[in-house]
Design a protein with these regions (language model features):
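Alpha-helical transmembrane bundle of multi-pass membrane proteins
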Residues: 1-174
Length: 174
């Protein structure tokens, strides 16, 4: 779970900083904010309907598809209207993952250790995400999105080893 947190926070921070380096800053920033809102709204719902593995897998796949589209199509059309849409797809996937790991965290760890585990994963993942601004600002054009894509694929692959929850959380009919 700690590596999934690290991947998610790194990718989230990276895409936030990349939005400021694109030619169409304002449309990309607006699209990024909209994808955050939509991702946060549907993330918890996906988790309760599909479970942790499936919902995180689908969300990582959305972010991978968005990163592939930005890399292959978007950078050649950075001033076009299609570029903010592609950024939205990549950001939507990682926003959903971010919401799901917050909601799912108490179910993955036993209740006695959930707060300690949350603090530990936050500390380590925030340390790891500190390199994202340097990668976004100092790397050539495809490198940041390739790292986004690779780390999203790593997070999706690690879902195979994620246990379904041992902790407990209050559920409601949604």
């Amino acid at each position: 779970m700690i590596v999934i947190w690290m991947v998610t926070l790194y990718n989230y921070t990276l895409i936030q900083f990349l939005v400021n380096t694109f030619e169409s800053v304002y449309p990309s920033a607006i699209a990024s904010s909209i994808s955050d809102i939509v991702g946060y709204l549907i993330g918890g719902w996906l988790f309760y309907k599909l479970g942790i593995r499936v919902s995180l897998g689908v969300s990582f796949c959305v972010s991978i598809v968005g990163a592939i589209l930005v890399t292959l199509v978007g950078f050649r059309h950075e001033s076009s209207w299609i570029f903010p849409i592609l950024v939205t797809i990549a950001k939507l996937g990682i926003s959903i993952v971010y919401q799901i790991i917050y909601v799912a965290h108490p179910t993955v760890f036993p209740t006695l250790f959930a707060a300690t585990a949350f603090g530990l994963v936050q500390f380590v993942s925030n340390l790891f995400s500190m390199i994202a601004p340097a990668v976004a600002e100092n790397s050539e054009e495809p490198v940041p999105m390739l790292s986004f894509m690779f780390l999203s694929a790593l997070g999706a692959g690690l879902l195979l080893f994620l246990r379904e929850g041992t902790g407990s959380v209050a559920t409601s009919k949604f």
